[in-house]
Structures are given as C-alpha cells and as structure tokens.
Amino acid sequence: MERKRFIDCDSTKILQELALNPLDLTAPGVLSAERIKKFSLLGGGFTFSFATERLDDAILAALISLAEERGLHESMLAMQQGQVVNYIEGFPSEMRPALHTATRAWVTDSSFTGEAEDIAVRSRVEAQRLKDFLTKVRSQFTTIVQIGIGGSELGPKALYRALRAYCPTDKHVHFISNIDPDNGAEVLDTIDCAKALVVVVSKSGTTIETAVNEAFFADYFAKKGLSFKDHFIAVTCEGSPMDDTGKYLEVFHLWESIGGRFSSTSMVGGVVLGFAYGFEVFLQLLQGASAMDQIALQPNARENLPMLSALISIWNRNFLGYPTEAVIPYSSGLEFFPAHLQQCCMESNGKSIVQDGRRVGFSTSPVIWGEPGTNGQHSFFQCLHQGTDIIPVEFIGFEKSQKGEDISFQGTTSSQKLFANMIAQAIALACGSENTNPNKNFDGNRPSSVLVSSQLNPYSLGELLSYYENKIVFQGFCWGINSFDQEGVSLGKALANRVLELLEGADASNFPEAASLLTLFNIKFR
C-alpha cells in the first residue's frame, strides 16, 4: 500500500493545528500525579516519563495516528526481517538492507528468514570465534588500541566508557581516530607495545584516516622490533583489502548491511569490549539490545518505547519548531554517549530528500548534543532555562551507582543528590518561576523527558543503545528519508583528495578555491 508523504498526512495537518496552542506546562496543577502516571511508559528495564513535554491527549492521539499513517510498525518489521531499506528510488544508491539488529538477534529466540537469518547466523559464528580468540590470547596482552573513525570509534568508545566503573578490569584501552598524528603519538608514549594488541577497524578496508594511523602504529612497532602479525588484528567486511589472515593475527568480519554508526553490537564493538571486560559482558550487552529490538516491534506506539520517543521528538522538531535537542545523562559513565548519538542521529537523519528523490519540504534531524549532569548545570543549563532558543532535553538517570560506593552528606547520599538534581531540572524547565525581577524570571514551557533504569550495567546499556538506534530509525521512517547512507561524508572525502593532489604538486587551476585558501594560510603546495 502506498503511503502518504509525511507532509501530506492527515495527522500532520491535525498536529499543525494543535501546535498553535500546545499544552501550557506552567498552568497551575498541570504536573499532577495523574498526568505524571498517565504520561509514562515502561520499556524493558526503563521507565520513560514524558509528562514534562508540551503535549496532551489530543496531541498524543494525533502522533499515534501519524505513526499508523506512515506505517512505522510495518517499516521496522521490514527492516528487521532484512528487506531493502537503504535506497533512493530512481537514482543510484546502495540498495541494501540495514541489519544491525541481526547482529544481536541470535542471543534471543528471534525468528527471521532470508538475509536477516543469514546475518544472525554469521554473527553467532563471529561471536564464537571472538570467544575462542580471547580465551587464547587475552592473557598475553595488557592493552588494546582500537584504530577506527566514525562508527568504528564513537560507539565502541562510548560503550567501553559506560562500563568502566561497573566491570573491574586490569586491561588498558585506547582509541585512535583522528588523522592528526598527535592523537596516535600520545597513546604510543603511554603503552608498552610488547604487551599491546592493536585492532584496526574499517568496514571498507580503505578508510584513509584508519589506514594512515595503522601505518603510523606499524612503523612504530617495527622500530621496536615487534612483528606486525603478532600484534595487529582487523575488523572489516569479507573480501575487503584488510581481509587478510596472512597479514593479521586474526580477522573478524562484519557485512555491508551493517552501517558503521549502527555497528557497535557487531565485532566493531565486540572485540574491544570482550578484551576489556570479558566475552560474557559483551554477551549481556547483546541480550539487552535484542530485548529492546523486540519492544521496537510492538505495533502500538503506547507500548513501544523507541517509537513513542521518536514521535515526541518529531512533535518538538516539526510542529513546535525546535532545531536542537540535548541528551543529558546523569551518569559519568555516559560521558561519551551523547557524541555517539550525535553521529547516529545526525548522520542518519540529516537528509534533505525523501526516498523518492524529492526535496523533503520540512525539517529533519535536530542538532544533537549533550554532556553529563550535574556538570552541565554549571555550564550550559543557563541557556536551557533562560536563553532565547527553546531546547528540548532528554534526561537519562539511574537509581543507583555502578560501583555502589557512596557517602551520606547533609542527610542524603551522592546518588540521591544526583537523581534529585535531574528531576528538579525537568520540573524547572517545564514550570519555570515567576519573579518581578526580570533577571530572575523563568518562563518555563521548556520541554523535556526523563528515562530511568535501576543501574547502568551491560544489559541496561544494551537496552539503551538499541532504544536510541530504533528511535532514530523510526524518525527516518516517519519522515520517509533514507537513514542508512551518508553521502555528505563521501563528498568531503572526495574534495579532501583533490586538496591532497595540490599538495602533491597538481596544477592550482584544477582546484582554485582550495589553492587560494592554502595560499592564505601559508601552506606550500607547489
């Protein structure tokens, strides 16, 4: 059945009308116990409160109707079953499924067929290979260095950091992404190369930043008299230039249908997490992620946490007109998580055409950013409360700390103070505070949602990762865009190569704009 475009949906028109007079969160009694209970949802181990969003029953009903008109449930089911979702009609495009969910489907009773089943089976095989590899070599190394960029660094780095306080380990972990040689040199200054394992991650096997950093490390190891094959392993697609067991100590695989920003539950994240914390920790992460994938298949948005959250974000973006969204985790372990979400959301949904090749005619991805609380309260929260731009916030919190070490100070523990601050911020943003002194007046009506679980551990981290991945995909399905390619990245790479040609002696007339900029900055290129 052919569906109406997002901009043409009946529900879109209703929501546009409702947006003219959204719920006033500052009105007396709005945040009642009844509303707080009603505007909440349980999803796996998480409780989601959206009582502090500017929506009511009518708006929520229209958003759910929008999900039905746009076929969000059917689209998610099609994606998880392996149908082609990465495409642009009538134009050359990747024409692939997006099967990151299959990389963890094998840990549950998920039953799929075709390519989804194939990727799930292959993922199980790779996981067993990883388990065997770690059993054999993990004790020989004290350090792992992961070389990769984009999804080969941001997701794995965020997950590793998130579990550092929960999972004791004697292993040291470093990530190298930037082509800036100082990035690699700083790490090499701190490690014992003889006890270091280097995992080189590139889906294509040709990523220039990764190749340069690999060469940088290989040269350093060689000067130390260390064999490349004894210390370097690869994670890449089957058949890529890096798929060479004659060169590497071991090669682990992912597949073309696994997008980089969605690849953390493949070997892209598995190798480093398994080395750092043990294979069982990685397995628990997969179990949590797969459980949330099942929730994402619920047809009713009121029972589907990532779908409902996606709809609320669309309400804020497309109908209330807010161009940015902050993700504020009240957990030090999640300090790198907003950066991962920034890539996952903005690279997926920062698109200006729908899948039939036409211009969208509406706003797509908001700018995603964030830092942990309470630190953020002492830096940018001033802007959230009294700035001229309204910035929706998604708070993430946990009932107890990871390590369980705490102190009672002035009648409450540190964990209680952390949680109290998060709740207070959501209420303050929503309700504001009137004051005759204009400098102390807070208008309120600044929307937020709050996502809470009992503790940040491998399983809940997997749930959280999957929640955001599925939320982002649901947004793309609703807008009708392709969330699984990244042509903007490709353009930048192509132009960078042309600049490099100038530095190698090419005629300046081949790229006069770049030549002029190089001249301005006194960069010699002839």
Swiss-Prot record:
Q: Which reaction does it catalyse?
A: alpha-D-glucose 6-phosphate = beta-D-fructose 6-phosphate
UniProt subcellular location = Cytoplasm
Instruction: State the active site.
Output: E347, H378, K493
Tell whether Cytoplasm is among the UniProt keywords.
yes
Classification via PANTHER family: GLUCOSE-6-PHOSPHATE ISOMERASE
Q: Return the protein name.
A: Glucose-6-phosphate isomerase
* A Pfam family the protein falls into: PGI
Q: List the disulfide bonds.
A: none
An example GO CC term for this entry is: cytosol
Q: Which family does it belong to?
A: Belongs to the GPI family.
GO MF terms here are: carbohydrate derivative binding; glucose-6-phosphate isomerase activity; monosaccharide binding
GO terms in the biological process aspect are:
gluconeogenesis; glucose 6-phosphate metabolic process; glycolytic process
Highest lineage ranks of the organism? Bacteria, Pseudomonadati, Chlamydiota, Chlamydiia, Chlamydiales
**Function summary:** Catalyzes the reversible isomerization of glucose-6-phosphate to fructose-6-phosphate.
Q: In which pathway does it act?
A: Carbohydrate biosynthesis; gluconeogenesis; Carbohydrate degradation; glycolysis; D-glyceraldehyde 3-phosphate and glycerone phosphate from D-glucose: step 2/4
Q: What is its EC number?
A: 5.3.1.9
InterPro entries, per the entry: G6P_Isomerase, G6P_Isomerase_C, Phosphoglucose_isomerase_CS, SIS_dom_sf, SIS_PGI_1, SIS_PGI_2
The species this protein was found in: Chlamydia pneumoniae
Determine the domain of life of the protein's source: Bacteria
- PROSITE patterns noted in UniProt: P_GLUCOSE_ISOMERASE_1 (PS00765), P_GLUCOSE_ISOMERASE_2 (PS00174), P_GLUCOSE_ISOMERASE_3 (PS51463)
Q: Which UniProt keywords apply?
A: Cytoplasm, Gluconeogenesis, Glycolysis, Isomerase
